[in-house]
């Protein structure tokens, strides 16, 4: 039995209907869009979590009806993912020896590459570019500003 409230179900239905509308109005949402759908509902799943819950990389492999999306949403929302931003902020603070909210650009890059989903040096560069991150005269960055900009998203997808 579902633990979702009527409001939650209605919210999922609205987002589902929007995705269905873009996808041909056939009552289905492609499994490749599951991550995007969850993100529209305020979640921040990793690609790995999306795939664990039935998301696919390629369009056309699988599709879901609303009744099949609800349990995915419910399971994902019940997992307290403790936000990724909190995890990154804690990691950044360990490098902030003087407690001034600043760490070196190199240390930020290391944290970005080690925590969460592994990213490449190029992806780090993209993050710095899209977030308009600039180092101070000592090569340091205000990591709280970086996190605010990253969490605000969205970023251009260069993988297409």
Curated annotation (Swiss-Prot):
Cellular compartments per GO CC: muscle myosin complex
Keywords from the UniProt entry: Motor protein, Muscle protein, Myosin, Repeat
InterPro entries per UniProt: CALM/Myosin/TropC-like, EF-hand-dom_pair, EF_hand_dom
GO MF: calcium ion binding
One Pfam family in the UniProt entry: EF-hand_6
Top-level lineage group: Eukaryota
Function comment: In molluscan muscle, calcium regulation is associated with myosin rather than with actin. Muscle myosin contains two types of light chains: the catalytic light chain, essential for ATPase activity, and the regulatory light chain, a calcium-binding protein responsible for Ca(2+) dependent binding and Ca(2+) dependent Mg-ATPase activity.
Protein name: Myosin catalytic light chain LC-1, mantle muscle
